[in-house]
Each structure stands twice: as C-alpha cells, then as structure tokens.
C-alpha cells in the first residue's frame, strides 16, 4: 500500500492523540490544535488504547470525513471516555496506557460472489466493514493477525461485530475492505514506532 504517513508524522499522530485525551481528562474541553501537511487532509482513523496488554478503548472514523488532526483528536477522546465496553479512562491511568493510532485508506466494496469473498481478503493487509440494513461492523487489519484468523473467520467475526449472524457475508451483506498504517507507543509516553501488521500477533 502507499505509505500514508512518514514515521515522523506517525509520531506526531500518536502524540496528538495522547495530548487530546489528557487535555480532555484534565479540562473537560476538546483540544483545539491544527497541524499542517497530511494532517489537513481527510483520512479515516482509529485510536486504540491498551493497558497491560488488554484493550481499554477503541473508537474511530472508518471513512475520510474529517481532517486527520480533527479525526485523531475526536477518536482519541472517544476511545478514552465513550467506548461502551469500558468504564471511562481516568487521568491517573494514562501513565499505564499505550496509545495506538491506525490511519485508514478509504474502504472499497468487494465486488465478488459471496462464496468468493474470502479470496479477496488478505490477512495482515485488509481490515473489513460489513453492512446489512441498519447494522454495520468494522474490524481493523491487526485484529485478524492478533487472533490468528483466516479470511472466513475474519468475515464471520466482522459480521458478529455488527450484531449480525456470523454467516451474513454469505447471505447478502455488503463487505468492504481497507488497509491501515499503525503507529503506537512502545511503552506509555515512550518511543513511537510503526507497527508491521503482519507481526502483530508475534
């Protein structure tokens, strides 16, 4: 895939996400900060928070509907305080939380017969979105690698993320794929590195 961000830009993205969270937790105000270059372009992005290796929050924008800097700030705050799976993050936790930002390519619908869909999903490269009626679910590319899924399992898990039966990809659901570029802290507040998706589970 085309590199979306340089390593330096990726570091800026992660630092911005952390700053946005901590500013919000301290002031209860959304950080007002603009960056130039790639950050002025519309991009999809997800912010993922982990604490001692466990997921602590993950929310984002699948589609490029906002400037990247705005999308990072909003997704970071939402991952910290609005993920319904978790209690809101406390400021005191931020010394134990690793911040990860995934920059997305625009999702493209996979134009294939349902039974052929797995052949169009490359594990370690593609993330998935499944839509059917009012239901929609998304899994980032790294999820399939972390949980050692094959393409069929990844499709089924994305269906279930949408609140749909696991075989919905065989029964008429729309399936979209996208790619992601991941930057994360090696340790809380530490060095920011680009992550090779294919090594996420190692």
Swiss-Prot record:
InterPro entries reported in the protein's UniProt record: AMMECR1, AMMECR1_dom_sf, AMMECR1_domain, AMMECR1_N, AmmeMemoSam_A, Uncharacterised_MJ0810
Highest taxon above the source species: Archaea
Disulfide bonds: none
All residue ranges annotated as the AMMECR1 domain in the record: 8-194
Pfam families: AMMECR1
NCBIfam families, A to Z: AmmeMemoSam_A, PRK00801.1, TIGR00296 family protein
Annotated protein name in UniProt: Protein AF_1969
Annotated source species: Archaeoglobus fulgidus (strain ATCC 49558 / DSM 4304 / JCM 9628 / NBRC 100126 / VC-16)
